[in-house]
Design a protein with these regions (language model features):
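Cytosolic catalytic domains that perform sulfur/thiol-centered chemistry
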Residues: 1-279
Length: 279
C-alpha cells in the first residue's frame, strides 16, 4: 500500500470538509502514565476531550464498543458478528470513506484504523498529526456530540492482519516470523516475547501525533526482511497498530498485529526474555 492510501494530511481534509461521503471519527484514548488509578480517574476521558472540541462533523469512536465484552484482556477486538454490527451502527457502510484521528497519540487513531480495516472497511485513512496538526493547518473545531445515521455494512474480514497467541507461539518456536515490540526500549529490555526486536512507536513519530517521513520510516524498518511475516505487539494492542501501519507504508504488506499482546502473553504465563544484566 502507498502512504497516501493510509494517511490523509490536514490540508486535504480541510479542502474536503463537508463532503457527504466522509465519515470522520475522533478515536482519542487518554493515557495518564505515572498516575495512580485514583489520579487518572479524575482526568478527562477520551470522550470528554472529544466533547470539548473536535473536527467539525466528527463522531466519537468509542473503542470499548469494538472490544470483546467478555474477553479476559482489555481492548481485544470484538467477535465478528458484534464487530460488524457495531461498525454499521456507527454509520459506516461498505462504500463509506472513513477518516480517523486522535487529539493526542497517533496510535489511538491507528488502533481504530486497524480494527475497521480488519473487518473489511476498505476506504479508511488516518489524519496525520491528529487534531494538533488540524488546528495548525487552520482547521476549526466544534464542541458537543455528533452521530452518523446507521448504515448497512457487510464484513469481509482480513484475517491476515490478526495474529493470535498461537501464531506468536509458533513464530517463537520456529522463527518463521519477525516479531516486533512497539514499546519503549527500556520496557523491552526489562521483558519481551522471546526473539522479539524493538522498534518503539516513538521512533516512528514526531512527538506523539505525526508519522515521520517515508525516508525516515524506511531507514528504521530497512533491516526488517521485506516479504517476511511481521508480527507487531505492545502492551495491549494499541501501539502495535502504529508499527503495523508504518510497515505498510514502505511496502511490507505481510504484517499482523498480535491483538492480545503482553496483556494476554503474560496473563497466560508464557515465557519472557530480558536484556537486563543478571535477569
Amino acid at each position: 500500500m502507498k502512504r497516501e492510501d493510509l494517511l490523509i494530511e490536514p490540508g486535504e481534509l480541510l479542502a474536503r470538509l463537508g463532503d457527504p461521503r466522509l465519515r470522520i471519527y475522533d478515536a482519542t484514548i487518554m493515557f495518564y502514565m505515572g498516575m495512580s488509578a485514583e489520579e487518572a480517574a479524575k482526568m478527562p476521558t477520551g470522550r470528554e476531550v472529544y466533547l470539548g472540541g473536535h473536527v467539525p462533523g466528527a463522531a466519537f469512536f468509542d473503542h470499548q464498543l469494538f472490544t470483546d465484552p467478555i474477553g479476559k484482556y482489555e481492548y481485544m477486538v470484538a467477535p465478528d458478528q458484534m464487530l460488524a454490527a457495531q461498525i454499521g451502527e456507527s454509520g459506516i457502510g461498505n462504500h463509506s470513506e472513513v477518516i480517523v484521528y486522535a487529539s493526542s497519540l497517533l496510535a489511538s487513531a491507528t488502533r481504530a484504523w486497524w480494527v475497521l480495516r480488519y473487518a473489511g472497511v476498505e476506504n479508511i485513512r488516518v489524519l496525520n498529526g491528529g487534531l494538533p496538526a488540524w488546528k495548525e493547518a487552520g482547521g476549526t473545531v466544534e464542541a458537543g456530540e455528533h452521530q452518523y445515521d446507521p448504515a448497512p455494512f457487510t464484513a469481509a474480514f482480513k484475517r491476515e492482519m490478526f495474529a493470535s497467541k498461537e501464531e506468536v507461539q509458533g513464530a517463537v518456536e520456529r522463527g518463521n516470523a519477525y516479531i516486533e515490540d512497539a514499546l519503549m526500549q527500556d520496557w523491552h529490555d526489562q521483558e519481551h516475547i522471546p526473539g522479539a526486536a524493538c522498534l518503539p512507536l516513538t521512533d516512528l513519530t514526531i512527538g506523539w501525533d505525526l508519522l515521520r517521513s517515508q525516508d525516515e520510516i524506511w531507514a528504521l524498518v530497512a533491516a526488517r526482511p521485506k516479504g517476511e511475516r511481521v508480527i507487531t505487539y505492545c502492551g495491549g494492542g494499541i501501539a502495535a497498530t502504529l508499527n503495523a501501519m508504518a510497515h505498510l507504508t514502505v511496502g511490507n504488506e505481510n504484517v499482523a498485529v498480535y491483538d492480545g499482546s503482553l496483556f494476554e502473553w503474560k496473563g497466560e504465563g508464557l515465557p519472557l526474555s530480558s536484556n537486563n544484566t543478571g535477569a
